[in-house]
Amino acid sequence: MSAKLTIGFLGAGKMATALAKGFIHANLADADQIIASDPIDAARSAFAREAGAKTTASNLEALKFAGVLLLAVKPDQVADVLKEVGGEFTEKQLLISIAAGVTLARLEGGLGSGARVIRVMPNTPALVGASATAYALGKNATVEDGRLAQKLFSAIGVAFQLKESLLDAVTGLSGSGPAYVYLIIEALSDGGVAAGLPRDVATKLTAQTVLGSAKMALETGLHPGALKDMVTSPGGTTIEGLHELEKAGVRGALMNAVRAATEKSKKLGQGQ
């Protein structure tokens, strides 16, 4: 690599581990250029085992090691962590936060004037290198900081730079979205079992159907409605199934789920 990128994770959970593995796999950092801090022994052990990187129980040790800090703790832990590291954070460092609902203003306020901050919303498919990520730059973050965020999070999926005002919607859609999809997979699999299929076959058929459908949507660029029509023959089986879904209000329920999760994200950002 042309420049040594040192990365410190404040929090060593599953998402931090997935990110570290993605960065290493994409040759954005070597394992010895990464450190993760966490008070929980088991979390540190898992991070070290899976990412091959060093760990510590001290947030300040991670802070002093890294040029780029990834804040990967739960939202209700952010204030305490910022209070601990804020006095030692320098303008030469960049903080990237993946804490859901925690605003740039709160992050910048906790680190002091001049802090370079980026707020990021990945999702759990980062664990398999297939995250849908959006990020917003803080007022002091540079264009180069934005390029770095794009490079880092493209290593684990796709990434989009947006205005911060849209990140709550991202949380409601792609942040919470995997859970909606898993519920759909479970329900379709149950339907397959009810129709006589073995559970393992029904689940694998369903998951592959979702995967293949998503791949077609991404690779063809066609509107989902057009792709739906490609499957739907006049008077056939698919239109009967779609009719039942429409009668049950599935479309509206999914839209409402995104709206509800978006509003919850806004409340989290306000400390509610």
Describe each PLM feature range.
Residues 1-57, 61, 130-131, 193-195:
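NAD(P)+-binding Rossmann beta1-loop-alpha1 motif at the extreme N-terminus of oxidoreductases
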Residues 2, 207-272:
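NAD(P)-dependent Rossmann-like dehydrogenase/reductase catalytic/cofactor-binding core
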Residues 19-20, 85, 188:
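Hydrophobic residues within alpha-helices
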Residues 34, 62, 107, 198-205, ...:
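Small-residue helix-packing motif on alpha-helices
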Residues 35, 41, 51, 59-135, ...:
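Rossmann-like NAD(P)(H) cofactor-binding subdomain of soluble oxidoreductases
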Residues 106-116, 132-170, 182-219:
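Internal alpha-helical scaffold of NAD(P)-dependent oxidoreductase catalytic cores
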Residues 118, 167-172, 224-229:
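Short pre-catalytic strand/loop immediately N-terminal to key active-site residues, enriched for Gly-Thr
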